[in-house]
Amino acid sequence: MIDTKLIVAIVVGVWALLFVVRMSIQKKRESKATDYRASNADKALLHLYGKKFSIDGRDLSLFETVSGENLEKIVALPEGSHRIAGVYQSTEVSALGQNINLESEMVEFDAELEKGHSYSVAMYAYSPEERREYYKGDVPRDVLSVPLTLVKGSENVKAYIIVYQES
């Protein structure tokens, strides 16, 4: 019969090995994202959270991108107005403590981007004003807010696509 100590040692060994591999992959991803930001400092950096993105009518896969944290895609764009389309995803916690996965339909809008700045585009369950109030004003500048509703034409907004200028 296999000894309990041997089983525990094997489990701990496998866990330690997988931990080291995961940390190595994370470090490479962070290094790649940092290098990408540095080499594109003269452009507008757009951080996208979702899927099926296109920019100016071109699929995101045609752009040079890097992956960041939390499945974000980072793309460098020239300064100016850009048409951004995509399906945005977010996770919110309900009053009962359950995770709720939110997903928009295809949303398309124009955003004015300035070179040398970083922008995040994501879906939130609250408005920019509510976030500003909650964090007592310590939030990035919101460039654009697109309210989403469950029923077309409804005034009861349930989520927002917000473009924040991070830097």
Q: Where are the regions a protein language model picked out?
A:
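Short loop/turn and low-complexity linker motifs enriched in small/turn-promoting residues
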Residues: M1-A76, V87-S167
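A short tyrosine-centered beta-strand micro-motif
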Residues: G80-I84
